[in-house]
Amino acid sequence: MVSPNAGSKVSIQSYKHNGQLHRTWENSVILKGTESVVIGANDRTKVIESDGRSWITREPAICYFHSKYWFNIIGMLRNDGIYYYCNISSPFVYDGEALKYIDYDLDVKVFPDMTFQLLDEDEYEEHRNLMNYPQVIDRILHQQLEILIRWIRQGKGPFSPDFVDNWYEMYLTYH
């Protein structure tokens, strides 16, 4: 699999299980790009929804994607600390055009004190039935959710102290 080069700008595209484009983030800067891990950053980035509406992100963010895990993690740097938004999703693929993944609706919001909240369980159930998620996918997603929660509790990976700050410092060297 090809991987994006550090310093390059790529778009990030999330899809739904049925193949429909869900959301696109334009111009994220790649800070690390390997076959297994991609770390990107963006600030005041244009986001385009599937219905054509668009908005601009409000704060700098560090985005973590892994080819093995069924989740991605966005660390948002705000005045009162780092907030994380975690998407339960397929592992990423990079096709030379964009970083792509399937969004499976379940999300976890993590607060600066590392407490967290599971979001969108109702949306997950609705889409699971509507798009007929296979039972094996449902099982994988719930197993991966448990791994993600373990990472949060253990301060592992992007949740480790200084991870987001250190990558943000790297991002500033590209500006």
UniProtKB/Swiss-Prot annotation:
UniProt keyword Electron transport present: no
Catalyzed chemical reaction(s): a ribonucleoside 5'-triphosphate + H2O = a ribonucleoside 5'-diphosphate + phosphate + H(+); a ribonucleoside 5'-diphosphate + H2O = a ribonucleoside 5'-phosphate + phosphate + H(+)
Protein name, as recorded: Nucleoside triphosphate/diphosphate phosphatase
Gene Ontology MF: a single term: magnesium ion binding
Reported cofactor(s): Mg(2+)
Positions annotated as active site in the UniProt record: R23
Record has DNA-binding as a keyword: no
